[in-house]
Regions:
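Intramembrane alpha-helical segments
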Residues: 1-71, 75
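Multi-pass membrane catalytic core of lipid/isoprenoid biosynthesis enzymes
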Residues: 1-27, 104-140
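Interhelical loop and helix-boundary elements at the membrane-water interface
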Residues: 1-3, 34-54, 99-118, 161-184
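Residues within membrane-spanning alpha-helices of integral membrane proteins
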Residues: 4-8, 26, 30, 48, ...
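Transmembrane alpha-helical segments that form the membrane-embedded catalytic/substrate-channel core
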Residues: 31-38, 57, 78-93, 150-162
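Alpha-helical transmembrane segments
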Residues: 71-83, 140-144
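Extended hydrophobic alpha-helices typical of membrane-associated regions
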Residues: 136-196
Length: 196
């Protein structure tokens, strides 16, 4: 715990050396993660949102460190936030038995795997609707569009399969598949930047 605190303090100090906005972003991420660990681990969807905020904030932080926060950096933040929240919900389907015993109020625990899988699908669709925007705005090159299209198809395929069979086994399988589609999405971001 002491080591983690020291690292967090060091990170906050270094972010302040960059600029005030980076410090505020780092502080917000530290605050959200601390609150999650202390109070909100068992809150289900709210906890999912908090985890996803911390996962997605590096896109905003990177923009603040470079040229400043833009519409495209906010789009990437939202895409990662939405898709990671969907994955957290799917993790809840896979862990529903243990979560129920521990009193974790995930969507799967409260409303069942079928309902949770549909919410995850909806979040993926929202992220997918945003995905062409960086190309349309002229920030990303054609390689981005090709790779993000593959990732989008993967998200749709995996989430539809889960709706059809929202079992623990299928949720575990889907959770792993989602990591692959996310990795392809990351490649889309990298190659789209290089070949812009």
């Amino acid at each position: 715990i002491v080591y983690a605190i020291l690292l967090s303090v060091a990170g906050l100090i270094f972010s302040l050396l960059i600029n005030q906005l980076c410090f505020l972003l780092a502080l917000s991420s530290f605050t959200v993660s601390s609150l999650y660990n202390a109070l909100f681990k068992k809150t289900g969807l709210l906890g999912n949102f908090m985890v996803s905020f911390c996962v997605a904030i590096p896109f905003i932080f990177g923009a603040a460190m470079a040229d400043g926060i833009s519409a495209v950096s906010l789009i990437f933040f939202l895409m990662v936030f939405l898709s990671n929240t969907a994955r957290e919900i799917i993790k809840g389907i896979a862990d529903v038995e243990g979560d129920r015993m521990r009193g974790v109020l995930t969507l799967a625990v409260k409303y069942g795997g079928k309902y949770a899988s549909k919410v995850a699908f909806l979040l993926f669709i929202l992220a997918i609707l945003l995905s062409p925007m960086p190309y349309i705005l002229g920030v990303m090159g054609y390689m981005y569009l090709v790779l993000v299209f593959i990732a989008d198809l993967g998200f749709i395929y995996s989430s539809i399969k889960l709706i059809g069979n929202p079992s623990k086994h299928m949720a575990l399988r889907t959770k792993k598949q989602i990591l692959l589609w996310m990795f392809i999405g990351l490649l889309a971001f990298l190659f789209g930047t290089i070949f812009a």
